[in-house]
Every structure is written in structure tokens, then in C-alpha cells.
Amino acid sequence: MSASLFWKCSCPRRITLCPHWRPCQRLRVSLRHAPHLKRCAATLRVAAGSHDVPLAWPGLAHFLEHLLFLGTERFPVEQGLMAYVRAQGGQLNARTCERATEFFFELPASAFAGGLERLCEMLAQPRMSLEDQHREREVLHAEFIAWSRDATAQRQFALFDGLHAAHPLRAFHAGNRYSLNLPNNAFQQALQQFHREYYQAGQMVLSLAGPQPLEELRALAERYGSCLPSGQHLEQTAPPALMTTGNQTYQQLSGQRLDLLFALERLPAGATAAVDFLCTWLQSAKPGGLLAELQQRQLAHSLKATLLYEFAGQALLHLEFDLTSVAASAPVQVRELLTEWLGFFSAQADWAPLREEYVLLQQRQIEVASALELSRRDSRQAADGLDESGLAALKQVLKQLQPQAVEHFSHDWRLPPANPFLRSTIEAPRAGLIRGQTSAHRGLRTFAQDRSRGRKESSALSFSQALPADPSGSALTLRWQLASPAPMGLHARLLRSLATLRDDARQAGVELIFTSCGKDWLLKLHGLPSPMPAVLLQALKALGRPAESFWQEQASVNAEAPLLTIRQLLKAFSEQPQPDSPAQPDPEALQALWASARWDGLGLALPAAIQEALSRTLQQMPGTADATLCRPVPAGTGQQWQNLPGSAGEHALLLFYPVPSASLADEAAWRLLGQLCQTPFYQRLRVELQLGYGVFSAVRQRNGRTGLLFGVQSPGATVTEILQHIAQFLEHLPEQLQALDEPSWNDQQQALAQQLQPATLPLDQAMELLWQAKLAGHSSDYLPQLQGCIEALTPAIVIQAARQLREAAGGCSALANRPCPGTPWQVAE
């Protein structure tokens, strides 16, 4: 029996609910029409997760999520959703949570129907052969080993130690070789029953978001959603109490990290929005708030408030503090101030100003969200504000957090002021005085001086016309090339000083990123263009001349938990860290660094008025404008090996093979080669050889050079063995490509060419492509030229590129957590 559907349709400024709503019998469908989107996304959320499986089979839900990607009779794995999305340049993932499992992907509109068809097919008709199960169980076991060795994951799991032992949050749910007893008939029956009971329409929500009209989205949902099995909605079993000791809070202290956890029970509808509302203001660093007072008293550097868990009226609130010292009195003082602030916050009358601000924050997040983010948001039925039910839930949350009223306050608490970037933009100031002038000399400043500086800045900052101006999304990248190494830890301190500004900018729809890449410092802004000049102005002030308090602050010594090894390697590959100067950072050292630095930049899709405002703002830019910074990096040769220190753990390796030349024809061939590599590389090393779950290949660009990046993290294979497996794969790659039929070639070639069309190219991808093209010295029509080169490719050209790859014709760079294995590899200088 096929599924029937009920609808929730939304488009800008209009939400309508269709009348036929039978949640106990029908697939729930949410549709969002957003004309500014360049891509489409689908999220299918199943109301069943790790806590819903039989106690005898921990990990079964996560295991099933993996199995569903292994193909169906109609779409075998090489034609399934994962391979299809990769070939179309999209993205996909899945996530098994405590009480839900999500499957989601994003694709160009032209390929969206094929993705939705494969998604619904794989959930409704999985193959789940025993052979597939054995292979995938080993992948899960590798994941489990990595999880058990990952400090961040273990620290997160340990947060639940204070809960009632019978609560499922305390249990093991990851799944491994021993908990997934495949030969046992009882396990196989449980697996089939879990899929049959929960993977049916009554237990699902399908959310679609894209630029198509609602009628088109609805037709897609009807066509492909109807293939899902029909069924009744099942009530999930309510868990036991989070805590049974009477005290609903506990703390954990490790070094300078303080974790406070609060168990909340019997919460009404609207609790998720209520806790999010509370967390928004609780962790605000604005003057008069809790974090500002903690920083003022030098008790804590940072505060992060998170809802760790929410289901059936239960919630677990987590407050993470980065303390400034290990003094025994610090946690006590932090809790006392928290109690005061909660008392102050609870005493407010319905929080009208903050509720208005919160609505604006939610609206702004919707404005700048991608199709994938919108579909995931809609699948969770996230609130757009704090309505009356949310207000009632907030009062209940605060009552449980702060049972007794606070009568006397030791501090003059204040509600956070409005975000300055949300309601209006700040006019960038005109040029100030020349060094040495006073206000009395202002009339003596010549327009020629202003124009001269402006011309230099304008020539150093170029505005690409590759994408049209877009009031819904623009990008700006600024680069400083440092003449000498920065003083020790200076970049990290500057980055921390931008934290409050980054939060305000993000709330206003602008992502602000300050990072390093080799000898360069990069400042990137991405999102709504209207707040960008004001955000940039504040960033340049903070970076160019930090406040006196910046130099007086005690540096945070609470080290971040290490990333997974493969992620450490990827971070190092991107940032190319350089040794700092041993000099201590001080105001004089910073000004000397800026005085010798040169800068340039690139803007994309910026409206003319914003370009003008940014040009004025850049008069505050430290360093010297220089339009000649981009010099193409010469093609390399040889095989260089770099060992990343301090990244011990599972064996992990990245191999980067640059294109042998700077010609766009060669780049086009290698880009198509990279697309053709993805699925067979993953299939060979992850599925067949079962090296581990951290297996990928992709086209990457670094320092203006395009190449193919291969990555593997394995709990069993050594780095030398991983090298051998990759070499064997590359050895047979030309033969594999020769076996492809003509339709497969044409489909892949057409898909790659379409990904570069301005109408469908996402802003962040376009910006990265154009920035790397600038570094490589390509002309302004790089994108159409590259697209033309891709369309002109023949199989013979790509197969020749595969032979070049096999021979490392453009050289090869290895980044690993093990020493150089010797010839033909050389230790990188």
C-alpha cells in the first residue's frame, strides 16, 4: 500500500496548511519555495533512533542507516543516492540521533528528481543482503574504534555520567562488531522488524526546499513519496526520569573546563524554542550579561549554552565554561553569578524586547540559509519565534532552573542590547585625519590625498562580475601577506578577540572568518551584503588597533579537545601552518607587522552601493594595498612528505596530486577525472578493503593550484599499506575509465559542466573557485573558459590525465601522522 500525504507549504511571507491532515495515517510533507535559492534539498526524518531499538541489540538503528545506502535492486550502489549526488556535485549525509534518524541531500534543480527518487527507493526497498551487512559492520566497527579514541566524543559522552543509570542516554548505542550479531536469527528478525515498523509513512516527515514553485515541489513529493510504505504513527516509548536524586543539576570539572548540566522534566509544548531562546541570551557577551560579568571578574573566558537532549517533555541543558584559573573557588563563584542572572532574567515581564529581537534573528537565519539548512529546519518544525506556548514553556524552564526568587543582586544586571547589524547598516566613515594632524587641520587635507589612497585600495580590491549582484548573498575575501612571522600566538589572540563580533555578524546573516594560510592572513565575509561594511569596519578596528584590554587579558590555556586525526590533517592541509616568531605579542610588534604587510582582496556578487561602502571602509585597512601580490605558483615535481607532529592515533594519510600544468584544459581534464574517481575509490578502499570509515577523494585547490586529494584514516592498516592500496587503485584507474560506456561519459561530463553555470553555482563554491583563480593568475572569465574546456573533453584526454595521475606528473604532497617511509618520498622542507 502506498503512502498518502498531508501538507505544510511555505514560501516567503506566506505559510498555508492544507486541510487534509491525518498524521496518524499519512506521510507528512513540508514544502518551502525560496526563489533566491540556487539548489534544492530534501530531508526525510524518521521518528525512530538509537533509543528505540531493542536493548539486546545496541547500535541497530545506526547500522540500519548505513545499510540503506548500499543500494537496491533497482539502484545498485554504483547508481545509488551517494554516487548520484557526488556525480552531480551535490552533498548528502545521514544522522542517527536518540529518537530520530535524518537523511538529507542537496542538488541542482535539474538533478533533484533523481535524488528524491533514489532516497525514497532506498528507504522503502533496501537490499540488506548478509554479505553487505558483514562489510558494513566492519565499517561501523572502525567508526566505533575511532569514536572510542576521540577525546571530544568521549568527553561529550561523559557529560551524561550524572544521569539516572536507567536512562538510555547512559547506555552504549554506537554499535560494533560484537553488539551486531549478524548470524543470530533473533538479530536479523529485530533488524527487519525495526525497518518494517518505523520506516513507513506514518513515522516520517519529508521536507523539500528549493526555488521551484510550490506546485512543482508538491508534484515531486507526491510522485516519489507515494512509494513509501503506508502505516500508522507509532508512539515512541517514554524514557525514565533523567535524575532520581531530587537534585536536578550536577557539575563536572576538568582542569579549567567547568560543565554544568540541568535536567528538566515535564516540560510543555514549545520547550525546544524556549530553551533556545534562553541559551541565546544566556551566552551573550554583551555588557550587563552573565558572560560579560564573568570576564570582568576574570572568572571565565567563554560560556557556551547547548540543549543536549529533548524528548517527551524532558530536556538536558549544558553550560560549558572555560575558566580563567583552577582555583577551587572559581566554580562556586560561577554558580553564584549564574543563580543571580537567572533570578534577574526570570523577573522580566514576558521579555517583549528580547522576543522581538529573537524573531528578527530567526528571520535572518532563514534569509541566509541554504536549501539544505532550510529543509532540515523544516523537518524539525523549528519555531520562527517564541509564541504563547513557547512563553509558557520558558517560564516552566526557568522555574525548574531557579526554584527560588533572588531578592538581592550583587551586580547591576541588564538585558542585552539589540544587535547593531540586524535593523540597519552603519555608514562607513569617511577618511580620517592624516597622521600628525589635529581637528584644526581637517580643512587642509586635500582631496588628492583621499583619492590617491582610494585608488590604491580600489586596485588592490577587485570585484568579480562572474555572478550578478545579489542582495541575498555576497562574498568578500581580504588577504594580508606578512613580510615576517607573527609573534607567538598573536593570530589566535586576535581570533578570540573577534568572538563577540562574529556572533553579532552571524546573527545578522554574515559569516566572519579570520584564518591563516601559510604566510597569509585571510579575512572572509559571506552572507547578506547590507551589514557587511559595518561588520568589516568593526573587524578592521579590532585587528588593526585592539583595545588596551586586549593586551591585558590572560590567554586561555584550556586546550581544545583534539580533532579526529584525518580532520587534523585536513586542517593543516588548508592552513599550511608556519612557525611563529618567538617574540611576545605587544602593541608595537603588531603595528610593525601591519606596517610591513601588503594586502589585496576579491569581492563577489556585491551590489554597487555596498562596493562603494566597502571601498570607504577599506581606508581603515592596516597594511599597504598591493594589486601585484598574486604570482602563480610554479608547477612542482617530486614527492614531498610532511609529518604532522602531535597527531598520533589511528594511521591517517592525505595525498595531494596537483595538475601538471596551469592550463585550463589540463585543469578541466583533472576535474572530470576527480569526479569519476570518487565512487570507485570509496567503493574499493572503504567497502571492499574495509580500511576504515575515513575514506574520500575530491578535487581541491591550494595556493592557486588545482589537484586531486585522497584521504584515508584506518584503525588497522599502516600508512605504508594505505600508500600501497592507493597506488594499486591509481594503477588500474585508466583501465576502469576505458571500460565506461559512452552514456556514462556524457552524463558525468554534462553534470560537471552544469555545476559551473552561474545560475546554479552556490556562492561559497563560486568564491573559492574565483579566489583560487586569482591566485593562479587566471583571467576574469575563468569560469566560462573552464566550462568550455570541460565541454570539449574526450575520453582519451581524461584517460591520459589518469595516466599522469598514476605517474604523479605534477608531483605529489603527502601529509601524514607517521614519518616519511623513504624513497621515492623526500621529507618536505
UniProtKB/Swiss-Prot annotation:
GO terms for cellular component: cytoplasm. Pathway: Cofactor biosynthesis; pyrroloquinoline quinone biosynthesis. The keyword Membrane does not apply. Keywords: Hydrolase, Metal-binding, Metalloprotease, PQQ biosynthesis, Protease, Zinc. Pfam families: Peptidase_M16, Peptidase_M16_C, PqqF-like_C_4, PqqF_C_3. InterPro entries: Metalloenz_LuxS/M16, Pept_M16_N, Pept_M16_Zn_BS, Peptidase_M16, Peptidase_M16_C, PQQ_synth_PqqF, PqqF-like_C_4, PqqF_C_3. One of its GO terms (molecular function) is zinc ion binding. Binds 1 zinc ion per subunit. The keyword Cell division does not apply. Its EC number is 3.4.24.-. Its cofactor is Zn(2+). The active site is at E65. Zn(2+) binds at H62, H66, E143. One of its GO terms (biological process) is pyrroloquinoline quinone biosynthetic process. Required for coenzyme pyrroloquinoline quinone (PQQ) biosynthesis. It is thought that this protein is a protease that cleaves peptides bond in a small peptide (gene pqqA), providing the glutamate and tyrosine residues which are necessary for the synthesis of PQQ. Belongs to the peptidase M16 family. This is Coenzyme PQQ synthesis protein F. It comes from Pseudomonas protegens (strain DSM 19095 / LMG 27888 / CFBP 6595 / CHA0). The gene is pqqF.
